[in-house]
């Protein structure tokens, strides 16, 4: 088997796995990923905390974050840049309010032809809120410097 064939086989396996995940319920995803309730709404689990330091805190952190239908990520802001990554389920509507600028709406998802994007960047101190537009959405959030609840503020 050539290296390229192996890569294609792995890509096909990933596609099948992601397609299969769409048949899961939100509660099954929460259980399989061992997610816990998040104070802003939804469910999360920290998956990475960089051992490299940026001053007194970790250089970066990453979480899984899931919203069920009817749940919202309440308006909040953090003291660091946050990158949202779409992983599965329905698209997610992310709204960002930075200073006096109008609210920016980003649709996270995998359908580029419907203006969905696989990631979005929220600047430090920008207000943000999110909601799924289906049964559930699984995203990841990467924060740099690393997330600390001391730098988290709910509206």
Language-model regions, residue ranges each:
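Non-catalytic, conserved peripheral segments adjacent to functional cores
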Residues: 17-121, 127-130, 134-137, 141-155
